[in-house]
Amino acid sequence: MNAKKLLIGLVLAVMPIVTMADGKLSNKPLPETISTFLSTHFSDVKVAFHKEKNRLSDERYNIHLMNGTDIEMDRNGNWTEIDGHKNALPTSVVPEKIQKFISENYPNQTVFSLDKKERDRIEVKLSNGWELLFDKNYQLINIDD
């Protein structure tokens, strides 16, 4: 019985820390740049909820859409990660040169996720499970199958 109480106490003590690290739910309107991005690329999908994360001078927004897509954006409305969770992302969110490369080389595949990495690299996950890594000039530099 004491072990059970200790476990419950530990879980309750740690939950606020985990919640703060992940950001807090927000009922404030999203910044205009983010709202414009969403209406441009995801006009047919509603926002389920969004969270704000503040780390030092780095403000981020995690937007969760009703279709399961998760989008992380900076305060300027630039996406840093878009994860469709096995749902195809709209081609309009994929950088044009990357979309052209995928259309020409993987015509039967769709993009499931985009992730901006360090040194201006973009990782693209395709519907076949392959991960393509592009440099800042949108040149393919690695394939992980």
Language-model features, listed with the residues they occupy:
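Bacterial N-terminal signal peptides that target proteins for export
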Residues: 1-10
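Interaction-mediating elements
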Residues: 22-145
